[in-house]
Amino acid sequence: MKNPVNQDTLRIPSGYPEPRDILRKHFPIIKDELCIRGGWGYDQEDAVIVYSFDEEINPKQHFDGISLEKVFINYRIREETEFAHETKYTGVNWERTGHQLVHGDNGILYDRETVEVTMFTPEAWDFLKNDWESHNGYKDDDKGKLHHEALREERIIRFTEVFWFNVMNILP
């Protein structure tokens, strides 16, 4: 089951609330850090606009753009996999695989981030968890552990996501 998910089906649906509002609602821990406006960042036209300062969010603190981008990447992926669709995923992780500064035709400087996302269906996660626990974590069983890793690799879902950030408001 290499990749039963078309990553386009994970995109935030049209008509969904703006990221600034919905992410602050679903993830209150970041409500005082999310100095963004704009879209979900799927392309230049939908870029996330990053601010180092936002009086409405937190008038006492300035943020660096890179940290805000990482926060946004993490929580957009969580929004896509936990809230925006009927199907939920678990064991979701991501790793940055690329970064590029792009000068748009409109004169705007964009930060284009590429990440690899890995996740599991709940059924695959439960299967792997039960296998691991029923074999006591394969303690002292290297062959069994290798077999478990093969089972994990068969069930993992991998895909690449791109994030576009308008960084004009964080330039010195």
Map each language-model feature to its residues.
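Cysteine-centric segments in proteins
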Residues: 2-110, 116-172
